Regions:
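Short glycine-/small-residue-rich Rossmann-like dinucleotide-binding loops
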Residues: 52-53, 195, 201-203, 229-230, ...
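Short acidic/histidine-rich motifs immediately flanking catalytic phosphotransfer sites
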Residues: 42-47, 67-69, 192-197, 220-223
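Rossmann-like dinucleotide/phosphate-binding beta-alpha-beta segment
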Residues: 134-221
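Structural alpha-helical scaffold elements that stabilize or flank donor/cofactor-binding regions
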Residues: 40-41, 189-190, 215, 279-280
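An N-terminal-biased, well-structured beta-alpha scaffold segment characteristic
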Residues: 2-94, 212
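Phosphate-binding beta-alpha-beta segment of Rossmann-like dinucleotide-binding domains, i.e.
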Residues: 89-145, 157-160
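Glycine-rich nucleotide-phosphate-binding loops and adjacent flexible coil segments
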Residues: 226
Length: 330
């Protein structure tokens, strides 16, 4: 079997090539993202493999189908970049539902600790032999209230970490987990009562810009926001205004709503044209990482193994829980 592999990075090759050789799968690696212009690169392949910022819209789906491709392999959990409605009945869409919930939950906590204990500032200062503690005062996590939006595997891992710090945890999820230890509250109450809010939910029409000017107004002054899920959960302009007004005490972002042409690439020699992102990065109380929360050895191995297994199952006519369909995703 041949697979057109888009948006390839060196760590993708390292994890997928050995599995491909062992399972008689030939990966054709392309650094380009999947778009209408690059879709023809998949001609002659049996499947297409994409990541979070590949654009699988209706036009791309039609191009792939015209070339005889019948399966789309997502090497990620999210599927908001795929037009599932248009793919229905044309392409089988298979995903990796949970490559490492620990990786993402731990990264969320790493961002939080870095922010509130000024680790990023201390690192830069001490490299210049500046050992002053001026403007380095943080705060304890113990006793603080953290709101967790989304209590799937990642959200629950983050909750367990927070409990280890002695934090009070409030939860919101439209589909609550069957766990009596979790304290669920309405979303507006979570926003109102939390000192820290961490997002671990998918991007849907309902969650798009769930953090906006109106919802920010209901939050505590000095609230800390963490987003390791999808960038468009947060209205970036509203966040910027909230930081400038000091309503938001800190923002810890591993994702950004307009990241697709910026993240995963070295832009150090270029002028960043996204003024909002540039201003956010310039803020002393904002930490931005480049969608790297998933990036651990364990997660990369799981992504590769699950993606290859999805393809082999498809070839054998076996479709399981990893299939994403329009009807199920609504």
């Amino acid at each position: 079997m041949k697979v057109a592999f888009y948006d390839t990075k060196p760590y993708d090759r390292a994890s997928f090539e050995p599995l491909g050789e062992a399972n008689h799968i030939r990966f054709k690696f392309f650094e380009d993202k999947l778009t209408e212009d690059t879709a023809p690169l998949a001609r002659g392949c049996d499947a297409v493999c994409v990541f979070v910022n590949d654009n699988v819209n209706a036009a791309v789906i039609d191009l792939l189908c015209d070339m005889g491709i019948r399966v789309l392999l997502l090497r990620c959990a999210g599927f908001n970049n795929v037009d599932l409605r248009h793919a229905s009945g044309k392409l089988t869409v298979l995903r990796v539902p949970a490559y490492s919930p620990y990786a993402i939950a731990e990264h969320a906590m790493a961002l939080l600790l870095t922010s509130i204990r000024r680790i990023h500032k201390a690192y830069i200062r001490t490299r210049d032999f500046n050992f002053s503690l001026t403007n380095m005062v943080g705060f304890d996590l113990h006793g603080k209230t953290v709101g967790v939006v989304g209590t799937g595997k990642i959200g629950r891992c983050f909750i367990n970490i927070c409990r280890g710090f002695g934090m009070k945890v409030l939860c919101y999820d439209p589909f609550p987990a069957d766990d009596p230890s979790l304290s669920y509250v309405p979303l507006d109450e979570l926003f109102r009562e939390s000192d820290i809010i961490s997002f671990h939910c998918p991007l849907t029409p309902e969650t798009h810009h769930v953090v906006n000017a109106e919802s920010l107004a209901t939050m505590k002054k000095g609230v800390v926001l963490i987003n390791t899920s999808r960038g468009a959960l947060i209205d970036s302009e509203a966040l910027l205004a909230g930081i400038k007004s000091r309503k938001v005490g800190a923002a810890c972002l591993d994702v950004y709503e307009e990241e697709s042409d910026i993240f995963f690439e070295d832009n150090s020699g270029h002028i960043l044209e996204d003024d909002t992102l540039a201003r956010l990065i310039s803020m002393p109380n904002v930490i931005v990482t480049s969608h790297q929360a998933f990036l651990t050895e364990e997660a990369l191995a799981n992504i590769a193994e699950t993606t290859v297994r999805n393809l082999l199952d498809f070839a054998e006519g076996k479709l399981g829980a990893n299939e994403v369909c329009y009807r199920c995703a609504k």
